[in-house]
Amino acid sequence: MKKTLNEVVKDRIMILDGAMGTMIQQYALTEEDFRGYRYRKTPGLMKGNNDMLNITRPDVVSDIHHKYLEAGADIITTNTFSSQRISQADYHLEEAAREMALAGARLARKAADEFATDERPRFVAGSVGPTNKTCSMSPDVSNPAAREIDYLTLYDVYLEQIEALVEGGADIILIETVFDTLNAKAAIDATMEAERRTGKTLPIMLSITVSDLAGRTLSGQTLEAVLASVSSYPLFSIGLNCSFGAPQMKPFLKELARKSPYYISAYPNAGLPNSMGEYDETAESMAPQMQEYVDEGLVNIIGGCCGTTEKFIAEYAKIVEGKQPHTPQPKSQTMWLSGLELLDVTPDIRFVNVGERCNVAGSRKFLRLINEKNYDEAVSIARKQVADGALVIDINMDDGLLDAREEMRTFLNIIASEPDIAKVPVMIDSSKWDVITAGLQCVQGKAIVNSISLKEGEEVFLSHARDVMRYGAAVVVMCFDEKGQATTYERRIEIAERAYRLLTEKVGMNPLDIIFDPNVLAIATGMSEHDNYALDFIRATEWIRKNLPGAHISGGVSNLSFSFRGNNYIREAMHAVFLYHAIGKGMDFGIVNPATKVAYGDIPTDQLEILEDVVLNRRADASERLVDLAEKIKLQQEALKNGAAQGATTATAAEPEWRKADVAERLSTALVKGVADYMDADLQEALAAYPKAVDIIEGPLMAGMNKVGELFGCGKMFLPQVVKTARTMKKAVAILQPYIEADKKEGTTTAGKVLMATVKGDVHDIGKNIVDVVMSCNNYEVIDLGVMVPAEQIVKKAVAENVDMIGLSGLITPSLEEMVNVATEMEHAGLDLPIMVGGATTSEMHVALKIAPVYSGIVVWVKDAAQNPLVAQRLMNADDRKKFKAELDDRYARLREEYAAHQQKLSSLDEARKNKLNLFE
């Protein structure tokens, strides 16, 4: 029985053939030889287009194959280095590219079969060159975002070529002379697709060419980085060809052999070209140089590139006789990531700091810069993060008013030209899968995808996982499934284990490429059910590291302290304490600000105790104590700003002072402070002063809620304080409820019926819950559908309950698209119910540009909870409602015009550079 490729390569060092072009030159072919009769009228010169000889002079190509086989080649390469549309476009022969590849493979197959025996099989490697274009570099020095070709175009071109090679009889696909790893990824991707289509196993040989003595590719990667970039793929071999002679290639070959889990190939040039562009090495002089490769156990396959002929191959065949082949290294037991350089996530790194500032959802400055197309300054943010110690850069372009796919591509392309940034891997962060794939198609290194989850079920999860593997990336897996986000220890480990089994058993993903995010959630919110969030994350981290071998742990650390936005010291101190404990249990990735100024060891002991009480949930009053500490620090900072002595800042405003105001002011202040101690007495006094109980709600209590909204909006109140306010409001409502009911019995009817929901994809509900309280206090009947509510459920319930209006809430960027979807579904259902939109990521501009155009009814953006009853009141009045709609239509039209005008004013990067001020003319 004929030996297989895998059997032969384990048994001995295999011989690859030599140069095709060098051999063709020996035949002194003319322009007419290249053209043949068929292409006699094709415009342009054809001489030098060696691949067309497969069609016009197949005898020459066959003769060369025979010579190499006679010299002892085990593997001959097809004459198809440029047999694809991109290269053939230079000769106006795009339509002949597939035929060239097919003919080339058939010629090689026929020759190999003539020499093959069961004991000495001969193999055909389908040659796939890099093309004359690159996916990773700009053709225009003044426009780093530009690309002459994109990944998918290259993929399609390669797929056509590779399918033809397989049809023609190729045993192996040789992706050679790789100078851009992104080009190589496209070729590997196409090869794996050809395998799926044909049902054939296609061993992939990958051969890199380094461009200088520093050992980097033309696109800037080190060989270690290249190895990491392709480490997810099932390669047969990796090696080097072209560029250098054997001595110059040797140190780089040793580097590959030292780290690669694949077989190693080497086919150097016949030395370095002389001043005439010719090669001076002979077969006899080069054989001893290649002997060093063999004797040192560096290679499994050797052959020749530029300048080599069948004589070189005959010499190489002699020197490998009886020699042991290289033994590939075991697969790395650590995660490999790469930009231009390798990031080997070894235990001594301990923690991979993922820079968080290149995120439009998390940085207002970065969002503004991207909106303004100020990429130079946006790039400087990435540069600073790397300088501050970020080992990976997170990039997120998810904003309702941005073309996220285009901005992701643009920014990744630009930073690819900045070596001080591009040296580190990127984390492509988006809630939109098309944005993630667009980003992956721009990255030659091994990136991290952030993220996938089981939220949409196993089928989508597995599909996304296969895409991750297709592009050679690692992946963040959120602990989120069809039931929702995991918030307890038990749910976190349940989802993590399920996802791990699916990824490793059904998709075949390397466990080292899996990074679990067990959900860093806000603590110290004032809600007891949130108190264990950090501790449960830490416990889940420990369990995952012990029970799911190879997997890593990450988290968006800033989420932890969301309650204290505006107080940077408290936030950074919370992060430091959390990371100290989480890293100790195995958390090894984190999306953080690398420039954070607070270290765990620098936190004063008294503060540390309070912070750890919160993070580890060690006492029931931990949140209150942290709020007090935050207030104290805030006062200290304000005193320092005002020039006061640092030690004289512990005084707080005396509570009795606000008690001296009138009852309306006292009620408002009580809400702002979240103090319910005096509520009974104050409300009794107010009931005597106001005609109806509801007037108290709409008057002083709503004034207090308005103030809360203002303070929270500008970061001067923290989430736990807002929750405390909401509870105080609920207490006030409970006290007033009997009086409200009595007023209703006297003829007052419900103000209206409101359906409220946090839209699909969003699990956050605190804002919605506050609106619920406020609306209920204003005599509205509220039907709360909860979180993660699909559009169809909202529509169905609205019809069934005959509601007067709908309130949509969302805290995260994906909610914006889902709100558009809800409005679209309502339009399709023929509804014209008013929609109130609110939440942290929402804006009036988004409503004007995205939601209002798809819905004929009223859509109104509500800035904060306190405004909802005022808006609802206008919506419930038939006459005012018409007037309100006309006002909104006019305002939205103006906003759209302003936005369009602003977009027109923004020059393109090219235009801006052309219009730059020249001080020297």
Predicted regions and their residues:
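Domain-level signal for soluble alpha/beta catalytic cores
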Residues: 1-921
